[in-house]
Amino acid sequence: MFLLTGYEYFLGFLLIAAAVPVLALVTNLIVAPKGRTGERKLTYESGMEPIGGAWIQFNIRYYMFALVFVIFDVETVFLYPWAVAFNRLGLLAFIEALIFIAILVIALAYAWRKGALEWS
């Protein structure tokens, strides 16, 4: 009897998952036009002529605000499954979730105190 019963599908999927990106890159190298000259080097802005330079510096507050948003968005992704299965998890999972929320509240207080949430 073959010992890897059931793993053939996984191995096949793994091989296909590795082959598809390689095939896409090789196809791009073969089919894509060579050389970038003239019009191909110009910036494209929805069919309009570009206005101003492409190298604009943004204020760091935008990045800090986005970073805080991503952190708390990921928090929601972690807390939603916990809330759905709350009745079945028990007291230990409740305490773990409270610790997780406490850490995030401390992080929010730190970001607030450092001014990461101030817009003006």
Curated annotation (Swiss-Prot):
Catalyses which reaction(s): a plastoquinone + NADH + (n+1) H(+)(in) = a plastoquinol + NAD(+) + n H(+)(out); a plastoquinone + NADPH + (n+1) H(+)(in) = a plastoquinol + NADP(+) + n H(+)(out)
InterPro entries recorded: NAD(P)H_OxRDtase_bac/plastid, NADH_UbQ/plastoQ_OxRdtase_su3, NDAH_ubi_oxred_su3_sf
A Pfam cross-reference name: Oxidored_q4
Enzyme superclass (EC): translocase
GO CC terms of this entry: NADH dehydrogenase complex; plasma membrane-derived thylakoid membrane
Main location: membrane
The keyword Methyltransferase is assigned to this record: no
Membrane association type: Multi-pass membrane protein
GO terms, molecular function: NADH dehydrogenase (ubiquinone) activity; quinone binding
Transmembrane annotation, as ranges: 10-30, 64-84, 89-109
Residue ranges the record marks as coiled coil: none
EC number: 7.1.1.-
Locations listed in the record: Cellular thylakoid membrane
Keyword Transferase: no
GO biological process, one term: photosynthesis, light reaction
Keywords: Membrane, NAD, NADP, Plastoquinone, Quinone, Thylakoid, Translocase, Transmembrane, Transmembrane helix, Transport
Family membership: Belongs to the complex I subunit 3 family.
The protein's role, per its UniProt record: NDH-1 shuttles electrons from an unknown electron donor, via FMN and iron-sulfur (Fe-S) centers, to quinones in the respiratory and/or the photosynthetic chain. The immediate electron acceptor for the enzyme in this species is believed to be plastoquinone. Couples the redox reaction to proton translocation, and thus conserves the redox energy in a proton gradient. Cyanobacterial NDH-1 also plays a role in inorganic carbon-concentration.
Subunit details: NDH-1 can be composed of about 15 different subunits; different subcomplexes with different compositions have been identified which probably have different functions.
Listed name of the protein: NAD(P)H-quinone oxidoreductase subunit 3
Organism of this sequence: Prochlorococcus marinus (strain AS9601)
